[in-house]
A protein has these predicted regions:
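Long, intrinsically disordered, low-complexity accessory segments associated with secretion
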Residues: 1-422
Length: 422
């Protein structure tokens, strides 16, 4: 059964904040609560806190320990696979020491014991004691891996236009119901300390691509979003979910996320490589580029062209007004052959090579039904001196050229490169 709570949901966990009103006696107020063993196993160790009054102590213990103590001196059976049941008496509950009917003593596992009395459910009892003089209003807080969220995006392209739709997928992987009067979503990089003391950095959506719950239509049309942006908190994006929410055990809830606006949408092909003297051939990669009107957290993205699925990938976190470039994979309809020709060498009077000039050519062939813009980028390492006759500086430069390849046609890109002797 769930408690009335406030929820703060992060990429890989949720913070539960349970409002409480406690009455104090002799300067102390106490709250006790029982968690099922399954729920407790998902709670981050050391995350239990109380806000609203000074904490005196927070204790937790298995609920079955007290009951086991009442069974000391009572007959039990030991059940082991492939063996006949053993009759015994429980001697000590703390380490499950039993005395066999034959007189020997044996420590056993909890799962091996059968009792004549009905045992309680496995769970953990939590006791919070705070300093207070009268009534105190506060919150019991803990973090649980049962709760998380991620944005899911769908880019629908047609002609020269594209629209980006977004859903917020909220998950409850646990067996408890959460009834939240207030719910907030946080996105961004969250650094946590594990129980072993190691730092881990989690990014919204990381490792979750493809784990989507509700299928989307060819053109994802969404109602008004209940999610409102609240700005940022120390580099984390913060959103409020209007009206709170109720999450049942195992539920995945999808609601419309922020309404994203796009400008500058374009499709193009890209060829990227590095300079060497070898001939190469291959395929260009398919790229979509656009500029979002607002910052968006990272999340899985489905791309559709006139309703047809053409790719899925993880969209990186975006910043308002900064272009986003998406690589959808190789384009079988757009291929290239790269050739390199040595044009000249410069030597000193002693015959030592000072520089060598090369011509690099990309011959592009398209079997596509429309003209396509192709961007060729080549990384040059070593001692580049000039590109197309223009002097350059640095040990690493990028030679970049663009060309339009006609439908069902060919085009070429050429540049010259002067390299100093290594």
């Amino acid at each position: 059964m769930g408690h009335a709570t406030d929820l703060r949901l992060y990429p890989t966990f949720g913070e539960v904040r349970q409002p409480l009103t406690l009455s104090a006696t002799n300067g102390r107020a106490v709250h006790e609560q029982t968690f099922s063993q399954a729920a407790w196993n998902l709670i981050e160790p050391g995350s239990l806190s109380f806000f609203g009054a000074p904490v005196v102590r927070i204790e937790s213990w298995p609920t079955d320990l007290e009951w086991l103590s009442t069974q000391e001196g009572q007959p039990v059976r030991i059940l082991r696979a492939g063996q006949a049941p053993l009759e015994a008496t429980l001697v000590r509950a703390s380490d499950l020491l039993v005395r066999l009917s034959s007189g020997e003593y044996l420590s056993v596992g909890r799962e091996e014991l059968a009792f004549s009395a009905l045992p309680p459910r496995d769970g953990v009892q939590v006791r919070v004691e705070v300093a207070a003089q009268a009534r105190v209003a506060g919150e019991l807080s803990y973090r649980t891996a049962a709760l998380s969220w991620q944005p899911r995006y769908e880019l629908g392209a047609g002609g020269t236009q594209a629209q980006l739709a977004a859903l917020a997928e909220i998950r409850n992987l646990g067996g408890e119901t959460y009834d939240a009067g207030q719910a907030e979503l946080f996105a961004g990089e969250v650094r946590q300390v594990s129980p072993g003391g190691l730092l881990s950095e989690q990014q919204s959506g990381a490792g979750l691509a493809g784990k989507t719950g509700t299928a989307t239509s060819a053109s994802l049309n969404l109602a008004a979003s209940p999610v409102t942006g609240l700005g940022e908190v120390r580099g984390l994006q913060r959103y409020a979910l209007a009206g709170g929410l109720t999450l049942r055990p195992g539920e995945r809830l999808n609601v419309p996320f922020v309404q994203a606006t796009l400008t500058g949408f374009t499709r193009y092909g890209r060829i990227m490589g590095y300079f060497d003297r070898q001939e190469r051939s291959g395929r260009a990669s398919r790229h979509y580029k656009f500029t979002p009107g607002q910052s968006l957290p990272t999340g899985p993205l489905t791309v559709r062209e006139d309703g047809a699925l053409v790719g899925t990938l993880q969209m990186p976190a975006t910043q308002a007004g900064r272009p986003v470039d998406l690589d959808l994979g190789a384009d079988n309809e757009l291929r290239y052959v790269r050739t390199v020709k040595q044009l000249a060498q410069e030597k000193n009077p002693a015959g030592k090579v000072l520089s060598t000039t090369f011509r690099v050519t990309y011959a592009l062939t398209s079997t596509k039904s429309a003209v396509v813009r192709v961007q060729v980028r080549e990384q040059v390492y070593g001692r580049p001196l000039a590109v197309d006759g223009k002097a350059v500086q640095g040990q690493q430069i990028t030679a970049e050229r663009g060309v339009e390849v006609p439908a069902g046609g060919q085009a070429s890109v050429t540049f010259t490169l002067k390299l100093g002797a290594g």
